[in-house]
């Protein structure tokens, strides 16, 4: 037989941000500006199986320093130094209590189950935790720009340099909780696996 079930799981989204700016006139021909922005947020979004959710944490910050120097009435020099950092963590969250015996990996949350199809993305139905649990990334950008603007009548010439260093660290191995695939509902009820994937040892990049 079949049974219809209706769920209204709670979606939790939270975000905070702030920004600060300061300007200072060093002298008539020089102006200094500094700015900083920070943003933090997290969300818990239930999956198709309402007993499990995806947990996402985001963070970003940007700091910049600018110095504008008036060389002459027709020449302007602008120097900028900046730093930005972005980070995210993507994980699995359980919205109910499960015994340890239901986990594919010892000490971890329950993994994913797919019925029909060769993978979770093509399955008829899915259950269990997020297959991308434990994914994270950190990226730093260091930027330096130095530019000159020359104005002559209705004409303007701009030239300068732009340098940037990128630092990127990540760990994006999926299926750490394990994913079990069954061909049909009958094979699922019989406990006959078609495929099982798990990443026991993952490594960071960067």
For the regions a language model picked out, list residue spans one by one.
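Short acidic-glycine motifs
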Residues: 1-206
